[in-house]
Amino acid sequence: MSTPPANVTTAHVLDLFSLKGKNCVVFGAAKGIGFSIATAFAQAGGNVIITYLTTDPTEKAKKLAEETGVQVHTLKIDISRSDTVEAGVEEIQKIFKEIHVVVANAGMPFRRSVLDSPPHEFEKVMNINTNSVYRVAYYMGKIFKKQGFGNLIATASMSATIVNAPQHIAAYCASKAAVRQLCKALAVEWAEFARINSVSPGYFATDMPGYEFLKQWEPYVPFKRLGLTPELRGTYLYLASNASSFVTGLDLIVDGGYTCL
């Protein structure tokens, strides 16, 4: 049976958002949304491991550690393969004896119609966007169960809920819908020892390929602009902290109202 945090009934509400003394891992955090998440966790007092594949964030991590006074480590992990994720998790355990919060954020954009995308391209999208979350959940879930506690947050997308138009991105929609549903299933399966939630961003200004492509949707967002990645920090911090201690199986859509239309 899940138990509430020891101080949940007595703590000041702002203290519930603290990650002081907690160890966090953010997969796919070299830049963009991932680095904003890592920054939020560090600013809230959590120690952080930032994983990456191509862009080395070591210098940014050092600066973040100096600014916040917490541990900020970097680790290169290829999330597209099970053996490298398993090896990466073993390295993570050498750094942190306990792991409190894990964010599966790595992913790839994909903008091609089904008839223009051979099956191997669909398989690649699913491998990076969906299978990687399963890999992280599989290896981290074993640790959570052994510890008796854990918190997994996955980055899905509003495309898990709606069908984007007029662009044709069926493969991407399918991959993110699978992430969303996987998290809901895990929330039930792991209720005794872990909380599992997902975040579904809408159109955000990032340095991922396709940013200029996204700008054409600004007029259709009720806020009339794209989101900024720092605007996601509070959402992930809420789910990572004791402020959401009775929240599991939730998909939080952060889209400036786009899916309301």
From Swiss-Prot:
It holds the Pfam family adh_short_C2. Its EC number is 1.-.-.-. Signal peptide: none annotated. GO terms for cellular component: cytosol; nucleus. Keywords: Cytoplasm, NADP, Nucleus, Oxidoreductase. The keyword Cytoplasm applies. It is found in: Cytoplasm; Nucleus. SUPFAM superfamilies: NAD(P)-binding Rossmann-fold domains (SSF51735). It is an enzyme of class 1 (oxidoreductase). It comes from the Eukaryota. Disulfide bonds: none annotated. The active site is at S157 (proton donor), Y172 (proton acceptor), K176 (lowers pka of active site tyr). One of its GO terms (molecular function) is oxidoreductase activity, acting on the CH-OH group of donors, NAD or NADP as acceptor. NADP(+) binds at I33, K60, D78, N105, Y172, K176, T206. PANTHER family: BENZIL REDUCTASE, L-XYLULOSE REDUCTASE-RELATED. Belongs to the short-chain dehydrogenases/reductases (SDR) family. This is Uncharacterized oxidoreductase C1739.08c. It comes from Schizosaccharomyces pombe (strain 972 / ATCC 24843).
